Amino acid sequence: MTLSAISHYRGGSIDDVTPLAKTLKAIYLKYGVTYRLSRFQTGPNAGDWFVVVQYANSTAYEKVQTMFAQDPEYQQIITEIAKIAKRINRELVIDLDL
């Protein structure tokens, strides 16, 4: 079963976040990881960011974490994102195949 990391971030305008997200998505794709970015439009979190990063399974998740730790391009983009957006929370979920 696929495994997803679901994160909520606060901060950064669309103009600030979009180029960083595009770079991060390209890095994730290089490792076979799916990346989706959405923006809350209503409610108390309006303007915040919702991120879903999907891995093939838990083994793939563990393997790629080691690779990310050794990838300077990945480390750099994460550092840049942290300058403009704060992660509010992050959860790992098992995706159900319905």
Features from the language model and the residues they span:
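Short S/T/G/P-rich N-terminal loop/turn motif that feeds into the first structured element of a domain
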Residues: 1-74, 80-98
